[in-house]
């Protein structure tokens, strides 16, 4: 019941947004693009808040800190600029988040021996332990995200989201 109420609320929100945007002096307003972008943004925000509140708070981690730690866990040592790129944040923001993770002993920095301007970051055993403890609960949130979708709908959505990501790929 609550779920359908949220769905209706989102529809009303969409309707209100579109009604307001129709008043904008834009020649050809693509209402579907607006709906997709709005729903994608709202879904991402809700997921982020849910995960930070219900899962990541046990380690006092932000979504961004968890994302960086997760990337280090998956790929091993990464250069700071690559971490920023993967997380969709500036290098300065990445450096600040890495400092926080370093203070928690979840990662360590090392300077490239050939090019001292390059800083590589790697996950520590404590960082691995944090990911391995957090991920089962994190995954529960991921599965809640797709509750009520058939396997076919999940595959279709995955394909469509990959297209969206490809459209926004900047490098």
From Swiss-Prot:
**DNA-binding region(s), chain positions:** 80-103
Classify the source by domain of life. Bacteria
On whether DNA-binding is a keyword of this UniProt record, the answer is: yes
Which GO MF term does the entry hold, naming one?
DNA-binding transcription factor activity
Keywords assigned by UniProt, alphabetized: DNA-binding, Transcription, Transcription regulation
One GO BP annotation is:
regulation of DNA-templated transcription
**PANTHER family attached to this UniProt entry:** MARR FAMILY REGULATORY PROTEIN, TRANSCRIPTIONAL REGULATOR, MARR FAMILY
Q: What is this protein called?
A: Uncharacterized HTH-type transcriptional regulator YwaE
What the entry lists under PROSITE patterns is as follows: HTH_MARR_1 (PS01117), HTH_MARR_2 (PS50995)
List each copy of the HTH marR-type domain by range: 33-166
Which SMART domains would you find in this protein's record? HTH_MARR
Does the entry feature the keyword RNA-binding, yes or no? no
